[in-house]
Amino acid sequence: MAKQEDVFKKVVSHAKEYGFIFPSSEIYDGLSAIYDYGQNGIELKNNIKQYWWKAMIQLNENIVGLDSAIFMHPTIWKASGHVDAFNDPLIDNKDSKKRFRADVLIEDYCAKLEDKAQKEIEKAKKRFGETFDEAQFVSTNPKVLEYREKQKTILSRMAKSLDNNDLADVKALIEELEIADPDTGSKNWTEVRQFNLMFGTKLGAAAENAMDLYLRPETAQGIFVNYLNVQKTSRHKLPFGIAQIGKAFRNEIVARQFIFRMREFEQMEMQFFVPPGTELKFYEEWKQKRLNWHLALGLGEENYKFHDHEKLAHYANAAADIEFRFPFGFKELEGIHSRTDFDLSAHERYSGKKLQYFDPERNESYVPYVVETSVGLDRLFLALFSHCLKDEVLEDGSERTVLSLPPALAPVKAAILPLMKKDGMGEYAEKIFNDLKYDFNLIYEDKDSIGKRYRRQDAIGTPFCITIDHDTLTDHTVTIRHRDTMEQERVAVSELRQIIDNKVNFRNLLSKI
Protein backbone atom coordinates (compact mmCIF):
# COMPACT_ATOMS: atom_id res chain seq x y z
CA MET A 1 0.00 0.00 0.00
CA ALA A 2 2.83 2.40 0.90
CA LYS A 3 4.44 1.79 -2.49
CA GLN A 4 1.15 2.53 -4.28
CA GLU A 5 0.77 5.75 -2.30
CA ASP A 6 4.31 6.77 -3.28
CA VAL A 7 3.52 6.10 -6.95
CA PHE A 8 0.39 8.21 -6.72
CA LYS A 9 2.24 11.08 -5.03
CA LYS A 10 4.81 10.93 -7.83
CA VAL A 11 2.00 11.15 -10.42
CA VAL A 12 0.48 14.22 -8.76
CA SER A 13 3.80 16.04 -8.33
CA HIS A 14 5.00 15.23 -11.86
CA ALA A 15 1.72 16.44 -13.35
CA LYS A 16 2.21 19.83 -11.72
CA GLU A 17 5.97 20.15 -12.22
CA TYR A 18 5.74 19.54 -15.97
CA GLY A 19 2.67 21.61 -16.81
CA PHE A 20 0.01 18.92 -17.06
CA ILE A 21 -2.33 19.71 -14.15
CA PHE A 22 -2.50 22.55 -11.62
CA PRO A 23 -4.79 23.02 -8.61
CA SER A 24 -7.46 25.51 -9.71
CA SER A 25 -7.28 29.03 -8.21
CA GLU A 26 -4.05 28.03 -6.49
CA ILE A 27 -2.96 31.57 -5.58
CA TYR A 28 -6.19 31.80 -3.56
CA ASP A 29 -5.47 28.45 -1.86
CA GLY A 30 -7.48 26.54 -4.47
CA LEU A 31 -10.83 24.79 -4.52
CA SER A 32 -11.25 21.20 -3.37
CA ALA A 33 -11.45 18.62 -6.19
CA ILE A 34 -11.21 21.20 -9.00
CA TYR A 35 -8.18 21.31 -11.30
CA ASP A 36 -6.85 23.19 -14.32
CA TYR A 37 -5.05 21.52 -17.22
CA GLY A 38 -1.74 23.17 -18.09
CA GLN A 39 0.03 23.59 -21.41
CA ASN A 40 0.98 19.92 -21.74
CA GLY A 41 -2.15 18.62 -20.04
CA ILE A 42 -4.52 20.28 -22.48
CA GLU A 43 -2.59 18.86 -25.44
CA LEU A 44 -2.77 15.33 -24.02
CA LYS A 45 -6.44 15.81 -23.15
CA ASN A 46 -7.28 17.05 -26.65
CA ASN A 47 -5.43 14.12 -28.21
CA ILE A 48 -7.43 11.66 -26.08
CA LYS A 49 -10.62 13.39 -27.25
CA GLN A 50 -9.49 13.15 -30.85
CA TYR A 51 -8.76 9.43 -30.51
CA TRP A 52 -12.23 8.81 -29.05
CA TRP A 53 -13.97 11.05 -31.61
CA LYS A 54 -12.25 9.44 -34.57
CA ALA A 55 -13.04 5.94 -33.26
CA MET A 56 -16.70 6.82 -32.69
CA ILE A 57 -17.56 9.15 -35.57
CA GLN A 58 -14.97 8.57 -38.28
CA LEU A 59 -14.96 4.77 -38.09
CA ASN A 60 -18.73 4.31 -37.77
CA GLU A 61 -21.06 5.37 -40.57
CA ASN A 62 -24.08 5.26 -38.27
CA ILE A 63 -22.76 7.46 -35.42
CA VAL A 64 -22.83 11.27 -35.55
CA GLY A 65 -21.76 14.01 -33.17
CA LEU A 66 -23.53 16.59 -31.02
CA ASP A 67 -22.62 19.45 -28.69
CA SER A 68 -25.58 20.20 -26.43
CA ALA A 69 -25.86 23.07 -23.95
CA ILE A 70 -24.83 22.79 -20.30
CA PHE A 71 -27.97 24.66 -19.21
CA MET A 72 -31.20 22.81 -20.01
CA HIS A 73 -34.84 23.15 -19.01
CA PRO A 74 -35.16 22.07 -15.35
CA THR A 75 -38.01 19.65 -16.11
CA ILE A 76 -35.50 17.53 -18.04
CA TRP A 77 -33.88 16.60 -14.74
CA LYS A 78 -37.23 15.78 -13.18
CA ALA A 79 -38.03 13.48 -16.11
CA SER A 80 -34.62 11.80 -16.01
CA GLY A 81 -34.97 10.99 -12.31
CA HIS A 82 -32.03 13.13 -11.21
CA VAL A 83 -34.10 15.46 -9.01
CA ASP A 84 -35.50 12.56 -6.99
CA ALA A 85 -32.88 9.83 -7.28
CA PHE A 86 -29.43 11.30 -8.03
CA ASN A 87 -28.01 10.76 -4.57
CA ASP A 88 -24.97 9.29 -2.85
CA PRO A 89 -25.22 7.43 0.48
CA LEU A 90 -22.71 9.14 2.77
CA ILE A 91 -21.41 8.27 6.21
CA ASP A 92 -19.15 10.22 8.58
CA ASN A 93 -16.52 8.86 10.92
CA LYS A 94 -17.11 10.47 14.31
CA ASP A 95 -13.46 10.32 15.35
CA SER A 96 -11.65 11.43 12.18
CA LYS A 97 -14.49 13.78 11.08
CA LYS A 98 -14.01 12.46 7.54
CA ARG A 99 -16.89 11.68 5.20
CA PHE A 100 -17.11 8.61 2.97
CA ARG A 101 -19.47 7.07 0.46
CA ALA A 102 -21.00 4.13 2.29
CA ASP A 103 -21.33 2.05 -0.88
CA VAL A 104 -17.67 2.64 -1.80
CA LEU A 105 -16.51 1.51 1.66
CA ILE A 106 -18.41 -1.74 1.16
CA GLU A 107 -17.21 -2.16 -2.44
CA ASP A 108 -13.59 -1.60 -1.33
CA TYR A 109 -14.06 -4.32 1.30
CA CYS A 110 -15.27 -6.68 -1.44
CA ALA A 111 -12.33 -5.68 -3.65
CA LYS A 112 -9.99 -6.90 -0.89
CA LEU A 113 -11.82 -10.23 -0.88
CA GLU A 114 -11.28 -10.47 -4.64
CA ASP A 115 -7.58 -9.66 -4.14
CA LYS A 116 -7.36 -12.63 -1.76
CA ALA A 117 -9.03 -14.85 -4.34
CA GLN A 118 -6.58 -13.67 -7.00
CA LYS A 119 -3.62 -14.44 -4.71
CA GLU A 120 -4.87 -18.01 -4.35
CA ILE A 121 -5.10 -18.27 -8.14
CA GLU A 122 -1.59 -16.84 -8.63
CA LYS A 123 -0.12 -19.25 -6.05
CA ALA A 124 -1.74 -22.18 -7.86
CA LYS A 125 -0.43 -20.94 -11.22
CA LYS A 126 3.13 -20.96 -9.89
CA ARG A 127 2.67 -24.37 -8.28
CA PHE A 128 1.19 -26.17 -11.30
CA GLY A 129 2.84 -24.24 -14.14
CA GLU A 130 1.66 -24.97 -17.68
CA THR A 131 -0.71 -27.73 -16.54
CA PHE A 132 -2.77 -25.27 -14.49
CA ASP A 133 -6.48 -25.22 -15.38
CA GLU A 134 -7.65 -21.88 -14.04
CA ALA A 135 -11.34 -22.39 -14.85
CA GLN A 136 -11.45 -25.68 -12.95
CA PHE A 137 -9.47 -24.26 -10.03
CA VAL A 138 -11.78 -21.24 -9.68
CA SER A 139 -14.87 -23.43 -9.74
CA THR A 140 -13.60 -25.96 -7.17
CA ASN A 141 -11.11 -24.32 -4.80
CA PRO A 142 -12.80 -23.82 -1.40
CA LYS A 143 -11.01 -20.57 -0.55
CA VAL A 144 -11.75 -18.91 -3.91
CA LEU A 145 -15.37 -20.05 -3.73
CA GLU A 146 -15.67 -18.73 -0.18
CA TYR A 147 -14.20 -15.30 -1.04
CA ARG A 148 -16.39 -14.88 -4.12
CA GLU A 149 -19.58 -16.13 -2.47
CA LYS A 150 -19.01 -13.68 0.37
CA GLN A 151 -18.55 -10.84 -2.13
CA LYS A 152 -21.76 -11.78 -3.91
CA THR A 153 -23.75 -11.95 -0.66
CA ILE A 154 -22.45 -8.58 0.56
CA LEU A 155 -23.02 -6.74 -2.73
CA SER A 156 -26.47 -8.25 -3.15
CA ARG A 157 -27.50 -7.16 0.33
CA MET A 158 -26.13 -3.65 -0.23
CA ALA A 159 -27.95 -3.34 -3.57
CA LYS A 160 -31.23 -4.44 -2.02
CA SER A 161 -30.84 -2.03 0.91
CA LEU A 162 -30.06 0.93 -1.37
CA ASP A 163 -32.95 0.07 -3.70
CA ASN A 164 -35.29 0.08 -0.69
CA ASN A 165 -33.62 3.19 0.77
CA ASP A 166 -32.91 1.11 3.89
CA LEU A 167 -29.93 3.18 5.01
CA ALA A 168 -29.99 1.67 8.50
CA ASP A 169 -29.16 -1.72 7.01
CA VAL A 170 -26.31 -0.20 4.98
CA LYS A 171 -24.80 1.06 8.25
CA ALA A 172 -25.48 -2.30 9.90
CA LEU A 173 -23.60 -4.02 7.06
CA ILE A 174 -20.61 -1.71 7.53
CA GLU A 175 -20.58 -2.49 11.25
CA GLU A 176 -21.00 -6.25 10.74
CA LEU A 177 -18.05 -6.29 8.35
CA GLU A 178 -16.06 -4.20 10.85
CA ILE A 179 -15.13 -1.72 8.14
CA ALA A 180 -12.84 0.99 9.49
CA ASP A 181 -11.85 4.47 8.38
CA PRO A 182 -9.04 3.60 5.92
CA ASP A 183 -6.89 6.46 7.23
CA THR A 184 -7.31 6.11 11.01
CA GLY A 185 -8.73 2.65 11.66
CA SER A 186 -11.70 4.07 13.59
CA LYS A 187 -15.02 2.17 13.39
CA ASN A 188 -17.10 4.89 15.04
CA TRP A 189 -19.68 5.74 12.34
CA THR A 190 -22.67 8.06 12.05
CA GLU A 191 -25.93 7.09 10.39
CA VAL A 192 -25.97 6.86 6.57
CA ARG A 193 -27.65 9.78 4.77
CA GLN A 194 -28.52 10.55 1.15
CA PHE A 195 -27.09 13.68 -0.55
CA ASN A 196 -28.27 15.01 -3.92
CA LEU A 197 -25.33 15.69 -6.23
CA MET A 198 -26.71 18.39 -8.54
CA PHE A 199 -25.50 22.00 -8.49
CA GLY A 200 -28.33 24.52 -8.56
CA THR A 201 -28.25 27.99 -10.13
CA LYS A 202 -30.66 30.70 -11.37
CA LEU A 203 -31.67 32.02 -14.79
CA GLY A 204 -33.00 35.57 -14.96
CA ALA A 205 -32.12 39.16 -14.10
CA ALA A 206 -34.45 39.64 -11.12
CA ALA A 207 -34.10 37.24 -8.20
CA GLU A 208 -37.85 37.02 -7.55
CA ASN A 209 -38.56 36.01 -11.17
CA ALA A 210 -35.50 33.81 -11.73
CA MET A 211 -35.94 30.23 -12.89
CA ASP A 212 -34.21 27.46 -10.95
CA LEU A 213 -31.70 25.65 -13.16
CA TYR A 214 -29.09 22.95 -12.69
CA LEU A 215 -25.58 22.50 -14.00
CA ARG A 216 -25.93 19.25 -15.91
CA PRO A 217 -24.74 16.22 -13.92
CA GLU A 218 -24.32 14.18 -17.13
CA THR A 219 -24.19 14.83 -20.87
CA ALA A 220 -26.60 12.03 -21.84
CA GLN A 221 -29.84 14.00 -21.43
CA GLY A 222 -28.73 16.56 -24.04
CA ILE A 223 -28.51 13.68 -26.50
CA PHE A 224 -31.92 12.25 -25.58
CA VAL A 225 -33.85 15.49 -26.01
CA ASN A 226 -32.15 16.02 -29.40
CA TYR A 227 -32.38 12.45 -30.65
CA LEU A 228 -35.34 13.06 -32.99
CA ASN A 229 -33.81 16.29 -34.39
CA VAL A 230 -30.59 14.43 -35.21
CA GLN A 231 -32.36 11.35 -36.59
CA LYS A 232 -34.56 13.34 -38.94
CA THR A 233 -31.85 15.68 -40.21
CA SER A 234 -29.19 12.97 -40.58
CA ARG A 235 -31.78 10.56 -42.08
CA HIS A 236 -30.28 7.65 -40.17
CA LYS A 237 -32.23 4.47 -39.64
CA LEU A 238 -32.01 2.48 -36.43
CA PRO A 239 -29.61 1.37 -35.12
CA PHE A 240 -27.65 4.64 -35.00
CA GLY A 241 -25.71 6.57 -32.38
CA ILE A 242 -25.10 10.11 -31.17
CA ALA A 243 -21.74 10.93 -29.57
CA GLN A 244 -20.82 13.90 -27.41
CA ILE A 245 -17.87 15.21 -25.40
CA GLY A 246 -18.68 17.76 -22.74
CA LYS A 247 -18.45 19.09 -19.20
CA ALA A 248 -20.61 17.77 -16.37
CA PHE A 249 -20.88 18.87 -12.75
CA ARG A 250 -21.53 16.93 -9.56
CA ASN A 251 -21.42 18.23 -6.01
CA GLU A 252 -19.31 15.31 -4.86
CA ILE A 253 -19.24 15.43 -1.07
CA VAL A 254 -16.41 12.91 -1.07
CA ALA A 255 -13.96 13.99 -3.78
CA ARG A 256 -10.52 12.43 -3.53
CA GLN A 257 -7.77 10.77 -5.54
CA PHE A 258 -6.68 13.76 -7.62
CA ILE A 259 -8.59 14.00 -10.93
CA PHE A 260 -10.28 10.61 -10.50
CA ARG A 261 -13.32 12.15 -8.80
CA MET A 262 -13.92 15.86 -9.40
CA ARG A 263 -16.79 18.30 -9.11
CA GLU A 264 -16.26 19.60 -12.64
CA PHE A 265 -15.27 16.93 -15.12
CA GLU A 266 -15.55 15.89 -18.74
CA GLN A 267 -17.41 12.93 -20.24
CA MET A 268 -17.17 11.20 -23.61
CA GLU A 269 -20.54 9.55 -24.16
CA MET A 270 -22.30 7.76 -26.99
CA GLN A 271 -25.98 6.82 -26.93
CA PHE A 272 -26.85 4.05 -29.40
CA PHE A 273 -30.53 3.87 -30.38
CA VAL A 274 -31.82 0.38 -31.20
CA PRO A 275 -35.14 -1.43 -31.81
CA PRO A 276 -36.76 -2.84 -28.64
CA GLY A 277 -35.74 -6.43 -28.04
CA THR A 278 -32.27 -6.00 -29.58
CA GLU A 279 -30.73 -3.92 -26.79
CA LEU A 280 -28.93 -6.75 -24.97
CA LYS A 281 -27.28 -7.94 -28.21
CA PHE A 282 -25.94 -4.44 -28.88
CA TYR A 283 -25.02 -4.06 -25.20
CA GLU A 284 -22.72 -7.10 -25.44
CA GLU A 285 -21.27 -5.85 -28.72
CA TRP A 286 -20.46 -2.43 -27.30
CA LYS A 287 -18.88 -3.94 -24.18
CA GLN A 288 -16.33 -5.70 -26.37
CA LYS A 289 -15.86 -2.77 -28.76
CA ARG A 290 -15.11 -0.40 -25.92
CA LEU A 291 -12.67 -2.81 -24.28
CA ASN A 292 -10.87 -3.20 -27.63
CA TRP A 293 -10.62 0.60 -27.87
CA HIS A 294 -8.90 0.75 -24.49
CA LEU A 295 -6.62 -2.21 -25.23
CA ALA A 296 -5.36 -0.48 -28.40
CA LEU A 297 -3.65 2.06 -26.13
CA GLY A 298 -1.20 -0.66 -25.09
CA LEU A 299 -1.55 -0.32 -21.31
CA GLY A 300 -1.73 -4.10 -20.82
CA GLU A 301 -4.73 -6.42 -20.94
CA GLU A 302 -4.07 -7.49 -17.35
CA ASN A 303 -4.85 -3.94 -16.19
CA TYR A 304 -8.49 -4.08 -17.33
CA LYS A 305 -11.47 -6.09 -16.16
CA PHE A 306 -15.25 -6.02 -16.48
CA HIS A 307 -17.40 -5.48 -13.41
CA ASP A 308 -21.04 -6.42 -14.01
CA HIS A 309 -23.43 -4.49 -11.78
CA GLU A 310 -25.47 -6.23 -9.10
CA LYS A 311 -27.19 -2.93 -8.27
CA LEU A 312 -28.70 -1.37 -11.40
CA ALA A 313 -29.52 2.30 -11.86
CA HIS A 314 -33.21 3.19 -12.13
CA TYR A 315 -32.97 3.40 -15.94
CA ALA A 316 -31.02 0.20 -16.74
CA ASN A 317 -31.70 -3.48 -17.38
CA ALA A 318 -27.99 -4.33 -17.72
CA ALA A 319 -24.81 -2.49 -16.78
CA ALA A 320 -21.08 -3.13 -16.63
CA ASP A 321 -17.96 -1.12 -15.89
CA ILE A 322 -14.61 -1.41 -17.56
CA GLU A 323 -12.28 -1.10 -14.58
CA PHE A 324 -8.61 -0.12 -14.77
CA ARG A 325 -5.80 -0.85 -12.34
CA PHE A 326 -5.03 2.63 -10.99
CA PRO A 327 -2.27 3.12 -8.38
CA PHE A 328 -5.04 2.90 -5.75
CA GLY A 329 -6.57 -0.30 -7.16
CA PHE A 330 -9.11 -1.35 -9.80
CA LYS A 331 -11.69 1.42 -10.31
CA GLU A 332 -14.29 2.34 -12.91
CA LEU A 333 -12.96 3.85 -16.12
CA GLU A 334 -15.96 3.46 -18.43
CA GLY A 335 -19.57 2.41 -18.03
CA ILE A 336 -21.67 0.51 -20.58
CA HIS A 337 -25.40 0.52 -19.84
CA SER A 338 -28.55 -0.82 -21.45
CA ARG A 339 -30.82 2.11 -20.57
CA THR A 340 -34.00 0.55 -22.07
CA ASP A 341 -36.53 3.20 -23.19
CA PHE A 342 -36.57 4.84 -19.77
CA ASP A 343 -35.21 8.25 -20.79
CA LEU A 344 -37.09 8.76 -24.05
CA SER A 345 -40.38 7.52 -22.57
CA ALA A 346 -39.96 9.80 -19.56
CA HIS A 347 -39.28 12.81 -21.81
CA GLU A 348 -42.38 11.93 -23.85
CA ARG A 349 -44.51 12.00 -20.70
CA TYR A 350 -43.08 15.19 -19.24
CA SER A 351 -42.84 17.17 -22.50
CA GLY A 352 -46.06 15.95 -24.11
CA LYS A 353 -44.13 15.48 -27.39
CA LYS A 354 -43.89 12.21 -29.31
CA LEU A 355 -40.38 10.77 -29.51
CA GLN A 356 -41.28 7.66 -31.48
CA TYR A 357 -39.39 6.34 -34.48
CA PHE A 358 -41.20 4.82 -37.46
CA ASP A 359 -39.44 1.61 -38.46
CA PRO A 360 -40.08 0.89 -42.18
CA GLU A 361 -38.89 -2.72 -41.84
CA ARG A 362 -41.25 -3.48 -38.95
CA ASN A 363 -43.91 -1.12 -40.31
CA GLU A 364 -44.54 0.24 -36.82
CA SER A 365 -43.67 3.17 -34.57
CA TYR A 366 -41.95 2.72 -31.22
CA VAL A 367 -39.77 4.46 -28.65
CA PRO A 368 -36.21 3.22 -29.25
CA TYR A 369 -34.16 1.48 -26.58
CA VAL A 370 -30.71 2.87 -25.81
CA VAL A 371 -27.27 1.39 -25.18
CA GLU A 372 -24.86 3.86 -23.61
CA THR A 373 -21.08 3.99 -23.46
CA SER A 374 -19.67 6.63 -21.11
CA VAL A 375 -15.99 7.15 -20.35
CA GLY A 376 -14.62 9.76 -17.95
CA LEU A 377 -12.07 11.79 -19.90
CA ASP A 378 -10.23 12.87 -16.76
CA ARG A 379 -10.11 9.29 -15.48
CA LEU A 380 -8.68 8.10 -18.78
CA PHE A 381 -6.10 10.89 -18.59
CA LEU A 382 -5.14 9.64 -15.11
CA ALA A 383 -5.01 6.01 -16.28
CA LEU A 384 -2.64 6.88 -19.11
CA PHE A 385 -0.52 9.24 -17.04
CA SER A 386 -0.12 6.92 -14.04
CA HIS A 387 0.63 3.84 -16.15
CA CYS A 388 3.06 5.53 -18.55
CA LEU A 389 5.08 7.45 -15.95
CA LYS A 390 8.22 5.43 -15.21
CA ASP A 391 11.54 5.85 -13.42
CA GLU A 392 14.32 3.97 -15.19
CA VAL A 393 17.86 3.09 -14.14
CA LEU A 394 20.10 3.15 -17.21
CA GLU A 395 23.11 0.95 -18.03
CA ASP A 396 25.55 3.62 -16.86
CA GLY A 397 23.81 3.83 -13.46
CA SER A 398 22.11 7.14 -14.17
CA GLU A 399 18.34 7.56 -13.86
CA ARG A 400 15.65 9.12 -15.98
CA THR A 401 11.91 9.73 -15.69
CA VAL A 402 9.99 9.00 -18.87
CA LEU A 403 6.33 9.37 -19.80
CA SER A 404 5.92 6.60 -22.37
CA LEU A 405 2.58 7.70 -23.81
CA PRO A 406 1.28 6.28 -27.09
CA PRO A 407 3.00 8.59 -29.62
CA ALA A 408 -0.31 9.70 -31.18
CA LEU A 409 -1.40 11.05 -27.79
CA ALA A 410 1.87 12.72 -26.79
CA PRO A 411 1.45 16.48 -26.13
CA VAL A 412 4.55 17.35 -28.17
CA LYS A 413 5.49 15.17 -31.14
CA ALA A 414 9.08 16.30 -31.58
CA ALA A 415 11.59 18.65 -29.97
CA ILE A 416 13.86 20.67 -32.25
CA LEU A 417 17.21 21.07 -30.46
CA PRO A 418 20.15 23.00 -31.93
CA LEU A 419 23.38 21.80 -30.31
CA MET A 420 24.32 25.47 -29.99
CA LYS A 421 22.64 28.71 -31.03
CA LYS A 422 25.75 30.01 -32.80
CA ASP A 423 27.44 29.11 -36.08
CA GLY A 424 24.13 28.97 -37.93
CA MET A 425 22.74 25.98 -36.02
CA GLY A 426 20.00 28.05 -34.38
CA GLU A 427 18.83 29.42 -37.71
CA TYR A 428 18.84 25.96 -39.32
CA ALA A 429 16.85 24.54 -36.39
CA GLU A 430 14.28 27.33 -36.70
CA LYS A 431 13.93 26.54 -40.40
CA ILE A 432 13.16 22.87 -39.58
CA PHE A 433 10.71 23.98 -36.88
CA ASN A 434 8.88 26.32 -39.24
CA ASP A 435 8.68 23.65 -41.93
CA LEU A 436 7.21 20.94 -39.65
CA LYS A 437 4.97 23.04 -37.39
CA TYR A 438 2.04 22.88 -39.83
CA ASP A 439 1.84 19.10 -39.38
CA PHE A 440 2.92 18.50 -35.79
CA ASN A 441 2.93 20.14 -32.38
CA LEU A 442 6.63 20.88 -31.79
CA ILE A 443 8.83 22.52 -29.20
CA TYR A 444 12.02 24.49 -29.89
CA GLU A 445 14.62 24.56 -27.12
CA ASP A 446 18.21 25.81 -27.13
CA LYS A 447 19.03 26.23 -23.41
CA ASP A 448 21.09 23.85 -21.22
CA SER A 449 23.12 20.82 -22.28
CA ILE A 450 21.66 18.43 -24.81
CA GLY A 451 21.43 15.75 -22.11
CA LYS A 452 19.28 17.92 -19.85
CA ARG A 453 17.06 18.82 -22.79
CA TYR A 454 16.60 15.12 -23.59
CA ARG A 455 15.54 14.47 -19.98
CA ARG A 456 12.96 17.27 -20.04
CA GLN A 457 11.42 15.89 -23.22
CA ASP A 458 11.37 12.35 -21.78
CA ALA A 459 9.45 13.70 -18.79
CA ILE A 460 6.64 15.15 -20.94
CA GLY A 461 6.49 12.17 -23.30
CA THR A 462 7.95 13.64 -26.51
CA PRO A 463 8.53 10.71 -28.93
CA PHE A 464 11.38 12.34 -30.89
CA CYS A 465 14.26 14.70 -30.16
CA ILE A 466 15.89 16.14 -33.29
CA THR A 467 19.39 17.53 -32.82
CA ILE A 468 20.95 19.99 -35.26
CA ASP A 469 24.78 20.06 -35.15
CA HIS A 470 27.73 21.28 -37.24
CA ASP A 471 27.39 18.45 -39.76
CA THR A 472 23.76 19.40 -40.40
CA LEU A 473 24.90 22.63 -42.02
CA THR A 474 26.86 20.77 -44.70
CA ASP A 475 25.21 17.37 -45.23
CA HIS A 476 21.63 18.32 -44.22
CA THR A 477 21.25 15.40 -41.83
CA VAL A 478 20.20 15.46 -38.17
CA THR A 479 20.35 13.12 -35.20
CA ILE A 480 16.93 11.81 -34.25
CA ARG A 481 16.57 10.26 -30.78
CA HIS A 482 13.74 7.85 -29.93
CA ARG A 483 12.12 8.36 -26.51
CA ASP A 484 11.48 4.77 -25.42
CA THR A 485 14.74 3.15 -26.56
CA MET A 486 16.96 6.28 -26.44
CA GLU A 487 18.47 5.00 -29.69
CA GLN A 488 19.87 7.65 -32.01
CA GLU A 489 20.17 7.58 -35.77
CA ARG A 490 21.30 9.95 -38.46
CA VAL A 491 18.60 10.84 -41.00
CA ALA A 492 18.15 13.34 -43.81
CA VAL A 493 16.20 16.47 -42.95
CA SER A 494 13.96 15.74 -45.94
CA GLU A 495 12.83 12.46 -44.27
CA LEU A 496 11.76 13.97 -40.94
CA ARG A 497 8.13 14.60 -41.80
CA GLN A 498 7.55 11.00 -42.90
CA ILE A 499 9.45 9.50 -39.95
CA ILE A 500 7.44 11.49 -37.41
CA ASP A 501 4.12 10.90 -39.15
CA ASN A 502 4.70 7.13 -39.30
CA LYS A 503 5.00 7.09 -35.52
CA VAL A 504 2.42 9.63 -34.33
CA ASN A 505 -0.43 9.17 -36.81
CA PHE A 506 -3.74 8.17 -35.21
CA ARG A 507 -3.93 5.38 -37.78
CA ASN A 508 -1.54 3.41 -35.54
CA LEU A 509 -4.12 3.33 -32.73
CA LEU A 510 -7.30 3.15 -34.78
CA SER A 511 -6.12 0.17 -36.82
CA LYS A 512 -5.71 -1.90 -33.62
CA ILE A 513 -9.31 -1.52 -32.45
Give, region by region, the residue ranges found by the protein language model:
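NTP/phosphate- and nucleic-acid-binding module
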Residues: 1-513
